[in-house]
């Protein structure tokens, strides 16, 4: 069951993101929380693989729950933004909502921000200047500061990457 759920989630995420050059990010998030964080809960790892399906694809919560169960769906909902809102509102709400997320969702959020900050440092979008990259690091740090403290190794890695990013952007 453990491996089946994770493999099924990988396949589902790949299918849902098939029109996007994107599947590497969800895999990176799941790998980060498993490898660095020592997380082996199949529902958390499956949710990490699926964490952007509600935001970035046509997936509905009912579909996730039917395929992967209530807990996986709850984790994904907990880390998903409401894409109907303007970007600034979504960013502000993500900072505020981080205080209320479950421990499982906090693990996924840490893995997500580690992956995203690493990309912003090493492979930023072409149209992001240094100020935009610094703003992203500041925002990501606020989100993680508000998350429940759940895993020292992931939290330390996030802080190391933020520090590396700030040094690189001087």
Please place each PLM-identified region on the residue numbering.
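Active-site helical microenvironments for divalent-metal-assisted chemistry
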Residues: 1-170
């Amino acid at each position: 069951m453990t491996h089946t759920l994770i493999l099924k989630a990988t396949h589902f995420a790949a299918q849902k993101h098939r029109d996007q050059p994107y599947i590497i990010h969800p895999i990176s998030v799941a790998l980060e929380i498993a490898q660095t964080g020592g997380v082996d809960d199949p529902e958390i790892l499956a949710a990490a693989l699926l964490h952007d399906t509600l935001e970035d694809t046509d997936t509905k919560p009912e579909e996730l729950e039917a395929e992967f169960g209530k807990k996986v769906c709850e984790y994904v909902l907990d880390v998903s933004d409401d894409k109907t809102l303007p970007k600034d509102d979504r960013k502000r709400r993500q900072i505020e909502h981080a205080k209320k997320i479950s421990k499982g969702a906090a693990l996924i959020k840490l893995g997500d921000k580690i992956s995203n900050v690493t990309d912003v440092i090493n492979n930023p979008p072409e149209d992001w200047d240094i100020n935009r990259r610094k703003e992203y690091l500041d925002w990501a740090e606020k989100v993680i500061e508000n998350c429940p403290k759940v895993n020292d190794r992931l939290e330390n890695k996030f802080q190391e990457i933020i520090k590396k990013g700030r040094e690189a952007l001087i």
